[in-house]
Amino acid sequence: WIMGHMVNAVYQIDEFVNLGANSIETDVSFDDNANPEYTYHGIPCDCGRSCLKWENCNDFLKGLRSATTPGNSKYQSKLILVVFDLKTGSLYDNQASEAGKKLAKNLLKHYWNNGNNGGRAYIVLSIPDLNHYPLIKGFTDTLKQEGHPELLEKVGYDFSGNDAVGDVAKAYKKAGVSGHVWQSDGITNCLLRGLTRVKEAVANRDSGNGYINKVYYWTVDKRATTRDALDAGVDGVMTNYPDVIADVMNEAAYKNKVRLATYEDSPWVTFKK
């Protein structure tokens, strides 16, 4: 999965997919009442990027629905996975469940079209704080209550705080999650970060009894870092430059080893070599 980083305005969806991304990451900020408000990152953000692009969250979801609904004039068949980077740092811990409920209702209405031929992309809810694990239950319970438990087949989870792998496992246990787990590791492109924890996550994924299904590394903009990440065995690379990742994947060393995921590749099934 080539994951376009910080895609927060509707027009950027086409921009990143046309550069080679089959997945995007979108920031979601919340208001004081835990309503998803804007798709917005804000300052500071990655070096070389504008941090200030934004939409109202529901407008973005509608644009995303168009881009991922077969038959729509805006349809992009390659776009198969969306990571919502949930900016829950502005919330009190006791608002996490409420944020999950409200996010579920917004997605159900504006993205899934109330279960009636809505967007088809797989969704990853990425949460920065392990203490906010109740967001997951708020989200899953709401989809069930609204009569759409089948949509949970399209939803996965990520804790993005670079916490110890064992601590992340405990948070999932509390949240009642087993499966559909992506594990992120990374840092802003302005700084360097080694691959120690990525390798630990990959080992957990491949152990047969770990909690991780897929591992992605962020933010990867350079060819050398891309090669290191592919060599470490990641499933996804988040990037500001999808074309760079696509180029590396076409190099002789990689073109017979890795390929771009398609809609038929389940993002929840651990790939067995």
UniProtKB/Swiss-Prot annotation:
Cystine pairs: C45-C51, C47-C190
Keyword line: Cytolysis, Dermonecrotic toxin, Disulfide bond, Hemolysis, Lipid degradation, Lipid metabolism, Lyase, Magnesium, Metal-binding, Secreted, Toxin
Cofactor: binding details: Binds 1 Mg(2+) ion per subunit.
Amino-acid positions noted as binding Mg(2+) in the UniProt annotation, renumbered to this chain: E25, D27, D85
Enzyme Commission number, as recorded: 4.6.1.-
The keyword Membrane is annotated on this UniProt entry: no
UniProt GO MF annotations: lyase activity; metal ion binding; phosphoric diester hydrolase activity; toxin activity
Compartments in which it is found: Secreted
Active site: H5, H41 (nucleophile)
Xref: SUPFAM superfamilies: PLC-like phosphodiesterases
Source organism superkingdom: Eukaryota
Reaction equations catalysed: an N-(acyl)-sphingosylphosphocholine = an N-(acyl)-sphingosyl-1,3-cyclic phosphate + choline; an N-(acyl)-sphingosylphosphoethanolamine = an N-(acyl)-sphingosyl-1,3-cyclic phosphate + ethanolamine; a 1-acyl-sn-glycero-3-phosphocholine = a 1-acyl-sn-glycero-2,3-cyclic phosphate + choline; a 1-acyl-sn-glycero-3-phosphoethanolamine = a 1-acyl-sn-glycero-2,3-cyclic phosphate + ethanolamine
GO cellular component entries: extracellular region
Expression by tissue: Expressed by the venom gland.
GO biological process terms on file: killing of cells of another organism; lipid catabolic process
Role description: Dermonecrotic toxins cleave the phosphodiester linkage between the phosphate and headgroup of certain phospholipids (sphingolipid and lysolipid substrates), forming an alcohol (often choline) and a cyclic phosphate. This toxin acts on sphingomyelin (SM). It may also act on ceramide phosphoethanolamine (CPE), lysophosphatidylcholine (LPC) and lysophosphatidylethanolamine (LPE), but not on lysophosphatidylserine (LPS), and lysophosphatidylglycerol (LPG). It acts by transphosphatidylation, releasing exclusively cyclic phosphate products as second products.
The family this protein is said to belong to: Belongs to the arthropod phospholipase D family. Class II subfamily.
Official protein name in the record: Dermonecrotic toxin LhSicTox-alphaIA2aviii
The species this protein was found in: Loxosceles hirsuta (Recluse spider)
